Amino acid sequence: VLAAQSGLRACDVVRLELGSINWRTREICLTQHKTGEPLSLPLEPESGNAIADYILNGRPDTAIANIFLCHTGVTRPLDARSASAVISRHMKQAGVPAERRAFHALRRTFGTRLLQNEVSLELIQQLLGHRDMNSMKPYLSIDEQGLKMCSLPLLFRGEVGGSK
């Protein structure tokens, strides 16, 4: 839920610590692993509730600061590869085609949905934590319906309004 609603990279989700979430202001604050840049994102209620439920009811009682922990064997922070495997397994159960079962697909979908909801490119850039607008291009696929809304009608000869 968190990855889909925040667009965070797997490496950033697994590095989140208990102190990364400000429950009062409903914000997630982190330093991005890939860029080293600080990032503050809104904590959506559904994500916040899921994280709180995990912390209170599913997370082992440990001094480890990371929110998400590996529960098999020795308790340790979850790594990006394991997080990706969990996401892939859930996507498979949901019927997502194999070629689309990737943690990063959640990030691309997040960017695309923002674009579909007419969020400015500058804000999308900030939310994805990109320094350069060009690095956003792979995330901003335009849906077929949105493309059809931009097209102009094409009239052929003999049709009303067309040339003869």
Predicted regions and their residues:
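C-terminal catalytic core of tyrosine-transesterase DNA break-rejoin enzymes
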Residues: V1, Q5, R107-R131
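Activation on folded, globular domain regions of eukaryotic proteins
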Residues: V1, R24-E27, A50, L56, ...
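Conserved tyrosine-mediated DNA breakage-rejoining catalytic core shared by Y-recombinases
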Residues: S6, A10-C11, R15-N49, N134
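Short, polar N-cap/turn motifs at the start of nucleic acid-interacting alpha helices
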Residues: S20-W23, R100, V119-L140, Q145, ...
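C-terminal catalytic core of Y-nucleophile DNA break-rejoin enzymes
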Residues: H33-A52, A65-S88
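DNA/chromatin major-groove-contacting recognition/catalytic segments
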Residues: I142-K164
